[in-house]
Regions:
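Iron-sulfur (Fe-S) cluster-binding modules
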Residues: 1-39, 50-61, 73-181
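Acidic beta-strand-to-loop metal/phosphate-binding motif
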Residues: 61-67
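Short acidic loop-to-helix transition motifs that present clustered carboxylates
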Residues: 43-49
Length: 181
Protein backbone atom coordinates (compact mmCIF):
# COMPACT_ATOMS: atom_id res chain seq x y z
CA UNK A 1 0.00 0.00 0.00
CA UNK A 2 1.36 3.44 -0.91
CA UNK A 3 2.21 5.59 2.08
CA UNK A 4 0.42 8.93 2.37
CA UNK A 5 1.33 9.95 5.93
CA UNK A 6 3.86 9.03 8.58
CA UNK A 7 3.24 8.82 12.31
CA UNK A 8 6.06 10.24 14.46
CA UNK A 9 6.42 8.94 18.02
CA UNK A 10 8.90 11.05 20.03
CA UNK A 11 10.19 9.68 23.32
CA UNK A 12 8.55 11.32 26.31
CA UNK A 13 11.38 10.56 28.74
CA UNK A 14 11.03 12.16 32.12
CA UNK A 15 13.72 14.59 33.29
CA UNK A 16 15.86 14.09 30.20
CA UNK A 17 16.86 16.93 27.92
CA UNK A 18 17.02 14.42 25.08
CA UNK A 19 13.26 13.86 25.35
CA UNK A 20 12.73 17.58 24.75
CA UNK A 21 15.09 17.28 21.77
CA UNK A 22 12.93 14.40 20.46
CA UNK A 23 9.69 16.35 20.85
CA UNK A 24 11.10 19.52 19.24
CA UNK A 25 12.54 17.44 16.38
CA UNK A 26 9.13 15.89 15.77
CA UNK A 27 7.54 19.35 15.59
CA UNK A 28 10.23 20.54 13.17
CA UNK A 29 9.43 17.63 10.86
CA UNK A 30 5.66 17.99 11.26
CA UNK A 31 5.51 21.77 10.79
CA UNK A 32 8.54 22.70 8.69
CA UNK A 33 10.10 19.78 6.82
CA UNK A 34 7.08 17.62 5.89
CA UNK A 35 3.94 19.64 6.67
CA UNK A 36 0.73 17.73 5.99
CA UNK A 37 2.64 14.47 5.54
CA UNK A 38 3.22 13.54 9.18
CA UNK A 39 1.20 13.15 12.36
CA UNK A 40 2.44 13.29 15.94
CA UNK A 41 1.52 10.46 18.26
CA UNK A 42 0.15 11.56 21.62
CA UNK A 43 1.17 8.85 24.09
CA UNK A 44 -1.37 9.74 26.83
CA UNK A 45 -4.21 9.67 24.29
CA UNK A 46 -2.87 6.44 22.81
CA UNK A 47 -2.64 4.79 26.23
CA UNK A 48 -6.20 5.88 27.02
CA UNK A 49 -7.36 4.19 23.82
CA UNK A 50 -8.37 7.33 21.90
CA UNK A 51 -9.50 5.89 18.58
CA UNK A 52 -7.80 8.55 16.44
CA UNK A 53 -4.42 7.79 18.00
CA UNK A 54 -4.86 4.02 17.76
CA UNK A 55 -5.82 4.27 14.07
CA UNK A 56 -2.87 6.57 13.40
CA UNK A 57 -0.44 3.86 14.51
CA UNK A 58 -2.33 0.99 12.90
CA UNK A 59 -2.79 2.63 9.49
CA UNK A 60 0.51 4.46 8.98
CA UNK A 61 4.21 3.67 9.27
CA UNK A 62 5.61 5.00 12.55
CA UNK A 63 9.03 6.56 13.06
CA UNK A 64 10.07 6.24 16.71
CA UNK A 65 12.57 8.70 18.19
CA UNK A 66 14.28 6.97 21.12
CA UNK A 67 16.28 9.36 23.26
CA UNK A 68 18.13 7.01 25.62
CA UNK A 69 19.06 3.38 26.19
CA UNK A 70 15.72 2.56 27.82
CA UNK A 71 14.15 2.96 24.35
CA UNK A 72 10.67 3.65 25.69
CA UNK A 73 9.16 4.34 22.26
CA UNK A 74 10.46 1.09 20.83
CA UNK A 75 9.35 -0.74 23.95
CA UNK A 76 5.78 0.53 23.68
CA UNK A 77 5.62 -0.39 20.00
CA UNK A 78 6.91 -3.90 20.78
CA UNK A 79 4.32 -4.35 23.51
CA UNK A 80 1.42 -3.38 21.27
CA UNK A 81 2.66 -5.73 18.57
CA UNK A 82 3.34 -3.12 15.90
CA UNK A 83 6.97 -2.66 14.94
CA UNK A 84 7.95 0.88 13.99
CA UNK A 85 8.87 1.40 10.35
CA UNK A 86 12.02 3.22 11.47
CA UNK A 87 13.81 4.26 14.64
CA UNK A 88 16.00 7.31 15.17
CA UNK A 89 18.33 6.83 18.13
CA UNK A 90 19.48 10.15 19.61
CA UNK A 91 22.65 8.79 21.31
CA UNK A 92 23.86 7.72 17.85
CA UNK A 93 23.12 11.18 16.44
CA UNK A 94 25.13 12.66 19.33
CA UNK A 95 28.11 10.36 18.75
CA UNK A 96 27.97 10.85 14.95
CA UNK A 97 27.76 14.64 15.00
CA UNK A 98 29.38 15.67 18.27
CA UNK A 99 26.28 17.73 19.03
CA UNK A 100 25.00 17.67 22.60
CA UNK A 101 21.49 18.08 24.03
CA UNK A 102 22.37 21.01 26.25
CA UNK A 103 21.10 21.49 29.79
CA UNK A 104 17.68 23.10 29.64
CA UNK A 105 14.64 20.81 29.49
CA UNK A 106 11.89 23.43 29.32
CA UNK A 107 13.30 25.47 26.43
CA UNK A 108 16.24 24.08 24.50
CA UNK A 109 19.36 26.19 24.42
CA UNK A 110 21.24 26.75 21.15
CA UNK A 111 23.18 23.45 21.27
CA UNK A 112 19.99 21.51 22.04
CA UNK A 113 18.25 23.23 19.11
CA UNK A 114 21.09 22.19 16.79
CA UNK A 115 20.73 18.58 17.93
CA UNK A 116 16.94 18.76 17.44
CA UNK A 117 17.52 20.01 13.87
CA UNK A 118 19.84 17.08 13.15
CA UNK A 119 17.41 14.56 14.66
CA UNK A 120 14.62 16.13 12.58
CA UNK A 121 16.78 15.71 9.47
CA UNK A 122 17.13 11.98 10.22
CA UNK A 123 13.39 11.57 10.84
CA UNK A 124 12.54 13.47 7.66
CA UNK A 125 14.99 11.39 5.61
CA UNK A 126 13.36 8.12 6.72
CA UNK A 127 9.83 9.52 6.35
CA UNK A 128 10.53 11.02 2.92
CA UNK A 129 11.86 7.68 1.73
CA UNK A 130 8.69 5.87 2.79
CA UNK A 131 6.50 8.55 1.22
CA UNK A 132 8.32 8.73 -2.12
CA UNK A 133 9.74 5.28 -2.85
CA UNK A 134 7.32 3.51 -5.18
CA UNK A 135 8.46 0.10 -3.97
CA UNK A 136 8.07 0.79 -0.25
CA UNK A 137 5.09 -1.22 0.92
CA UNK A 138 3.41 -0.75 4.28
CA UNK A 139 0.84 -3.21 5.60
CA UNK A 140 -1.72 -2.05 8.15
CA UNK A 141 -1.50 -3.78 11.51
CA UNK A 142 -3.71 -4.14 14.56
CA UNK A 143 -2.76 -3.09 18.09
CA UNK A 144 -2.67 -5.97 20.56
CA UNK A 145 -4.99 -5.62 23.55
CA UNK A 146 -3.77 -3.26 26.23
CA UNK A 147 -3.16 -4.56 29.73
CA UNK A 148 -2.28 -3.21 33.16
CA UNK A 149 1.43 -3.86 32.62
CA UNK A 150 1.73 -1.89 29.39
CA UNK A 151 4.52 0.32 30.71
CA UNK A 152 6.42 -2.52 32.36
CA UNK A 153 8.38 -3.65 29.35
CA UNK A 154 11.80 -5.19 29.33
CA UNK A 155 14.79 -5.31 27.06
CA UNK A 156 13.42 -8.56 25.64
CA UNK A 157 10.45 -6.67 24.17
CA UNK A 158 12.82 -4.31 22.39
CA UNK A 159 15.09 -7.17 21.32
CA UNK A 160 12.12 -8.74 19.52
CA UNK A 161 12.15 -5.79 17.11
CA UNK A 162 15.54 -7.03 15.86
CA UNK A 163 16.73 -3.64 14.59
CA UNK A 164 18.95 -3.41 11.51
CA UNK A 165 21.08 -0.28 11.13
CA UNK A 166 20.31 1.53 7.88
CA UNK A 167 22.86 4.26 8.50
CA UNK A 168 24.24 5.94 11.63
CA UNK A 169 21.32 6.72 13.99
CA UNK A 170 18.66 5.27 11.64
CA UNK A 171 17.34 1.75 12.17
CA UNK A 172 14.43 -0.41 11.08
CA UNK A 173 13.10 -3.70 12.43
CA UNK A 174 14.20 -6.66 10.31
CA UNK A 175 10.53 -7.56 9.81
CA UNK A 176 9.70 -4.20 8.20
CA UNK A 177 10.24 -3.31 4.53
CA UNK A 178 13.73 -2.02 3.68
CA UNK A 179 14.30 1.69 3.52
CA UNK A 180 17.28 2.53 1.29
CA UNK A 181 19.33 -0.32 2.77
Amino acid sequence: MAVKRICIFPCGGMKKVESTVARIASYIVNEDLLPGKTMLMCVPAFLRGVEEDILMVENNPTVVIDCHEESCGSGLMALIGIPPAARIYIPDVVSQTGLIPGRNRQVLDLVGERLAQEVARCVAKAAQWMLEDQYYSFEKRKVKAFNQNLCEFSDEAIDLLDYVQVEPAIYRPKSMPPLWD
